[in-house]
């Protein structure tokens, strides 16, 4: 066989590299290297499938399969970098137990609640599913059905789901798993600014003089963003990094000062900083007088528990979000009690360190970026805590300018773009609209071409309330999509599993893998993943990114979008709408929900010829469904402060940060000259509020619902580790990631271990009144809790640690507190 000089050089280079690595190439390997037709890899862009950072990756496909991924060097978010999970994206779709066909619990050839899973056709799956939905609707009306979605849905999938539930079934019982991670951030944005999502952007990392992490281990949870902080800190000696947490973790390694505080005492620390700013005459009066109002939050609001729970019954103002007007003097008097002495006593942080932190906020010459994730949001006073940090930035005027940014980070790839912007929460509609507002409902009904009164005005059941309703039998048909709540959610044994196994209920789980949730369900629908479909995500800095389908899915798996739309064909309008509503739109008689919701002249406006050839969803519908859904959804936000670019634009760029007006993205919102919605001459314009002013909201320290006792003497905190993402559905199927961290461990202080006769690697029983788990202890390594607290990650399906978590929530946001519950720890003999 002849070999060209070029091929000879390439082959020798490969052989040399192999020799260095200790590998012997067979003689025929030179042929493989030289034959470009057989080794050609096709590359295209896509946002990463994991966290809310929104890194762009280049995806390499060959012979219909993803074979490689790499960081996208043209991406402004990650600039070519990936984290360890991102580098193994090519393997997440190819786990050995990938689901390829629908599975239904069967006995004697028919569905049976206690039957074994058996393969069925999609038609059979939807026949049984539709029968159960119709029975639930007949029994309890629209509130008898529910849906639990995801911040991992694409924008189009979430939007289609909102239409299916709120307009089709006329049920607001739809909520995303982002309720567990971002609801408190949303609540505080809406209360403080009247509009959701961060005012700053990632460019702030290159401008800030000080970084303050409030309950965020960015080194492991947002590692690419952490590289930008690291670069800023190491390149500019004046820059300071501050890390606040209830335990020591990897982010402390870069910190100039680390602050380990008692659980829940962050409320006291934030109020102390506000008091320090006032007492040291560091208030930016020009900003405060022109751009803020003061409010008092209602206190003693309970813990979002069942109404008959003693803790809930004891609250003076359960679940109240009411606020009253106060003056600056009232606010000053209220925070005055949070002296450095009191804050130090409550938190366990030294007075010197507290003052050091407060000075960085108070100094007008120091630009401060505050960052937080679950440590602040998963908190029974999470909305308050978010607001208290906004108070600090508003008092000093350190907001909406480069480097001055209170920044709520997100954990899922489209918790912002889908859960929040699309409005898949039980109380929301797209673009910050809410179902309780008749004007907002009218806007949605007009865009969707529906008769007035279609959308019900009462918010539906949120995530935790859905569990309770399933257990109580008031929701009987339930669809879980793109999440693993049986592992991730709180209080599994008491409140969730009983509802799934309630014989009156029918539970459907759409997932690519047999998760804990899937195995507890009655019907499992196999789902297409990531670039097996076309979609769009929205990241933490308001950046919307789109991607094309790049490979076909496996077996009979279908996208969530296809499943939603196909299921809608099983219902006529007469079966889901009352006669009174039908009388307003007689032209819809005899039509299916699919006809009314998805073939309405908007969604089906763009022909199939505009789509890429490889687009299974578009081919199935006969029109460019992703573009149609996106453009109809975008109509909600245009001229409303949430402007999106035309859909086709997103395929040409590495994302754009909304609002996008006249083709230009917005970096800093609310700032004149940067935000097109900020009025000329305003300086700052918080236009989410009618008067353009943000709120400084006074809220005190209030204790958590449970504290350690003689019997349950340790705090338990649950969370994540670098190598795994959430419940490990994808990462535990990547061999390299699984081998790196195969098991969840109980990280414990050596003194606490010694007091219990424990050595590193011993198996322990962690228990409280909600359940127990067995896990091995770790006294060294990346996570080092203080005495009295243990940390256990929740990625390990064999150790369902979240079964111990109380289903207490922030009463305002309905978000669960995973960061503090009492347990006892004993050695397994």
UniProtKB/Swiss-Prot annotation:
Keyword Acetylation found: no
Subcellular location: Periplasm
Group of enzyme by EC: oxidoreductase
4Fe-4S Mo/W bis-MGD-type domain location: 41-97
Gene name of this polypeptide: napA
Annotated residues for binding of [4Fe-4S] cluster: 48, 51, 55, 83
One CC-aspect GO term: periplasmic space
Cofactor(s) named in the record: [4Fe-4S] cluster; Mo-bis(molybdopterin guanine dinucleotide)
Record note on cofactor: Binds 1 [4Fe-4S] cluster.
Family indicated by similarity: Belongs to the prokaryotic molybdopterin-containing oxidoreductase family. NasA/NapA/NarB subfamily.
Assembly mode: Component of the periplasmic nitrate reductase NapAB complex composed of NapA and NapB.
Native source organism of the sequence: Vibrio atlanticus (strain LGP32) (Vibrio splendidus (strain Mel32))
EC nos: 1.9.6.1
Alphabetical keyword list: 4Fe-4S, Electron transport, Iron, Iron-sulfur, Metal-binding, Molybdenum, Nitrate assimilation, Oxidoreductase, Periplasm, Signal, Transport
PROSITE patterns in UniProt: 4FE4S_MOW_BIS_MGD, MOLYBDOPTERIN_PROK_1, TAT
Biological processes annotated in GO: cellular respiration; Mo-molybdopterin cofactor biosynthetic process; nitrate assimilation
Record's function text: Catalytic subunit of the periplasmic nitrate reductase complex NapAB. Receives electrons from NapB and catalyzes the reduction of nitrate to nitrite.
Protein name (database record): Periplasmic nitrate reductase
Entry's Gene Ontology molecular function annotations: 4 iron, 4 sulfur cluster binding; electron transfer activity; iron ion binding; molybdenum ion binding; molybdopterin cofactor binding; nitrate reductase (cytochrome) activity
Reactions catalysed according to its record: 2 Fe(II)-[cytochrome] + nitrate + 2 H(+) = 2 Fe(III)-[cytochrome] + nitrite + H2O
Binding site residues for Mo-bis(molybdopterin guanine dinucleotide): 85, 152, 177, 181, 214-221, 245-249, 264-266, 374, 378, 484, 510-511, 533, 560, 718-727, 802, 819
């Amino acid at each position: 066989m002849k070999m060209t000089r070029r091929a000879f050089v390439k082959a020798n280079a490969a052989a040399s590299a192999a020799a260095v690595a200790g590998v012997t190439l067979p003689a025929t390997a030179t042929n493989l290297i030289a034959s470009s037709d057989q080794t050609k890899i096709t590359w295209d862009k896509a946002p990463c499938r994991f966290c809310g950072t929104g890194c762009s990756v280049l995806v390499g496909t060959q012979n219909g399969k993803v074979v490689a991924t790499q960081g996208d060097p043209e991406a402004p978010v990650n600039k070519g970098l990936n984290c360890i999970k991102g580098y193994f994206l090519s393997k997440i779709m190819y786990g050995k137990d990938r689901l390829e066909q629908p599975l239904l619990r069967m006995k004697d050839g028919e569905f049976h609640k206690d039957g074994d899973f058996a393969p069925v056709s999609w038609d059979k799956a939807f026949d049984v599913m539709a029968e159960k939905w119709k029975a639930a609707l007949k029994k309890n009306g629209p509130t008898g059905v529910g849906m639990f979605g995801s911040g991992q849905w694409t924008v189009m999938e979430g939007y289609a789901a909102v239409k299916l539930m709120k307009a089709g079934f006329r049920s607001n019982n739809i909520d995303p798993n982002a309720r567990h991670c971002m609801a408190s951030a949303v609540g505080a944005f809406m209360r403080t600014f009247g509009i959701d999502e961060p005012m700053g952007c990632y460019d702030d990392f290159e401008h800030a003089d000080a970084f303050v992490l409030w309950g965020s281990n960015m080194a492991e949870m947002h590692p690419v963003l952490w590289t930008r902080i690291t670069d800023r800190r190491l390149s500019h000696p004046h820059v300071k990094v501050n890390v606040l947490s209830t335990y020591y973790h990897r982010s402390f390694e870069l910190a100039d000062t680390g602050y380990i505080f008692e659980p829940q005492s962050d409320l006291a620390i934030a109020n102390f900083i506000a008091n320090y700013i006032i007492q040291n005459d560091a208030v930016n009066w020009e900003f405060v007088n022109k751009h803020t109002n003061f409010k008092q939050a209602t206190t003693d609001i309970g813990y979002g528990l069942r109404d008959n729970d003693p803790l809930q019954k004891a609250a003076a103002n359960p679940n109240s979000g009411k606020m009253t007007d106060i003056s600056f003097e009232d606010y000053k008097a209220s925070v005055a009690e949070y002296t450095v002495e009191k804050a130090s006593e409550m938190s366990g942080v030294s007075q010197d360190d507290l003052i050091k932190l407060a000075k960085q906020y108070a100094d007008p010459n120091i630009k401060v970026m505050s960052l937080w994730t679950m440590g602040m949001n998963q908190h029974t006073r999470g909305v308050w805590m978010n607001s208290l940090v906004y108070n600090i930035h508003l008092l000093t005027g350190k907001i909406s300018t480069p480097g001055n940014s209170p920044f709520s980070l997100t954990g899922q790839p489209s918790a912002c773009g889908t859960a929040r912007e699309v409005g898949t929460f039980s109380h929301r509609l797209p673009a910050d609209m809410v179902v309780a507002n008749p004007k907002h409902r009218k806007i949605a009904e007009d865009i969707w071409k529906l008769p007035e009164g279609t959308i019900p005005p009462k918010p539906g059941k949120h995530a935790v309330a859905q569990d309770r309703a399933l257990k109580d039998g008031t929701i009987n048909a339930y669809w879980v999509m793109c999440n693993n709540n049986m592992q991730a959610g709180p209080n599994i044994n008491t409140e969730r599993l009983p509802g799934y196994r309630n014989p009156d209920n029918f539970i459907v789980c759409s997932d690519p893998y047999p998760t804990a949730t899937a195995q507890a369900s009655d019907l499992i629908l196999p789902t297409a993943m990531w670039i097996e479909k076309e979609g769009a995500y929205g990241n933490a800095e308001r950046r919307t990114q789109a991607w094309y389908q790049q490979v076909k899915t496996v077996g009979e798996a279908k996208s969530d979008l296809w499943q939603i739309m196909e299921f809608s064909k099983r219902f006529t309008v007469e079966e889901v709408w009352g006669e009174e509503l039908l009388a307003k739109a007689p032209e819809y008689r005899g039509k299916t929900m699919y006809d009314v919701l998805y073939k309405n002249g908007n969604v089906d406006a763009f022909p199939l010829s505009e789509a890429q050839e490889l687009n299974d969803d578009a081919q199935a519908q006969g029109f460019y469904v992703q573009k149609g859904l996106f453009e109809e959804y975008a109509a909600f936000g245009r001229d409303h402060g949430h402007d999106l670019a035309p859909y086709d634009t997103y395929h040409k760029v590495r994302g754009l940060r909304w609002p996008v007006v006249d083709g230009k993205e917005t970096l800093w919102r609310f700032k004149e000259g940067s935000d097109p919605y900020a009025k000329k001459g305003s300086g700052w314009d918080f236009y989410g509020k009618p008067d353009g002013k943000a709120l400084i909201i006074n809220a005190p320290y209030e204790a958590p619902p449970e504290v350690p006792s003689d019997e349950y003497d340790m705090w338990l905190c649950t969370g994540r580790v670098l190598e795994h993402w959430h419940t490990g559905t994808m990462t535990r199927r990547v061999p390299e990631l699984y081998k790196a961290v195969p098991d969840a461990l109980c990280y414990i202080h050596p003194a606490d271990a010694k007091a219990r006769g424990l050595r590193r690697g011993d198996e322990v029983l962690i228990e409280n009144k909600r359940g127990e788990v067995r896990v091995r202890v770790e006294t060294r390594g990346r996570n080092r809790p203080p005495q009295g607290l243990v940390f256990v990650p929740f990625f390990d399906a064999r150790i369902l640690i979240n079964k111990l978590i109380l289903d207490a929530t922030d009463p305002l946001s309905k978000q669960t507190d995973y960061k503090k519950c009492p347990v006892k720890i004993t050695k397994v003999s």
